[in-house]
């Protein structure tokens, strides 16, 4: 009975913390206008990152929890993010966003974002079709996306890319506007 009580308490505390983080993100995402395309970058969560208020042995922050956090921008702001189960569910992509949508994907890594911003470094990335024949949604991101959500819990070094202009920040994320080059 004690183990069950401890598990219920841990789960409740974890939900409380995730709810606080997601509420923080929802408030900051108000900078994203309706119809905008949102690219998500997620740095690996440090192994020592734990849920606040929960013993470390019971509550590690799980990266999977944040993979689809951008779906809140779809709900709240009528924005687009590229891997929202399209094709496998009744969710359809508008013709405008078909070229930057994937049925199954995960956020970009910081390395992919940095390399793909530079045409020379982008050549070293694998940007061929996936198992269902879709190209990576993030290719040519500076030309196709309007905003970048960078999730890193404040622990990852961020590259200085001229394409990114910070517009909002939270305790574990930053939102950037994509600045398109004039060339």
Where are these regions (language model features)?
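Solvent-exposed soluble domains appended to multi-pass membrane proteins
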Residues: 149-183
């Amino acid at each position: 009975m004690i183990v069950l009580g401890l598990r219920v308490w841990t789960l409740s505390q974890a939900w409380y913390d995730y709810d606080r983080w997601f509420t923080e993100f929802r408030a900051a995402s108000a900078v994203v206008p309706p119809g905008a395309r949102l690219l998500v970058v997620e740095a690996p969560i440090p192994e020592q990152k734990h849920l606040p208020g929960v013993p470390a042995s019971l509550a590690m922050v799980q990266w999977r929890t944040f993979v689809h956090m951008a779906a809140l921008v779809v709900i709240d702001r009528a924005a687009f993010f590229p891997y929202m189960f399209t094709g496998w569910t009744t969710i359809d992509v508008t013709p405008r966003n078909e070229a930057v949508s994937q049925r199954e994907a995960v956020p970009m890594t910081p390395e992919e974002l940095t390399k793909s911003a530079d045409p020379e470094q982008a050549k070293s990335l694998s940007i061929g079709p996936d198992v269902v024949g879709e190209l990576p949604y993030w290719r040519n991101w500076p030309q196709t996306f309007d905003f970048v959500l960078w999730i890193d819990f404040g622990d990852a070094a961020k590259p200085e890319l001229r394409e990114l202009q910070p517009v909002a920040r939270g305790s574990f994320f930053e939102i950037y506007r994509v600045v398109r080059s004039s060339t």
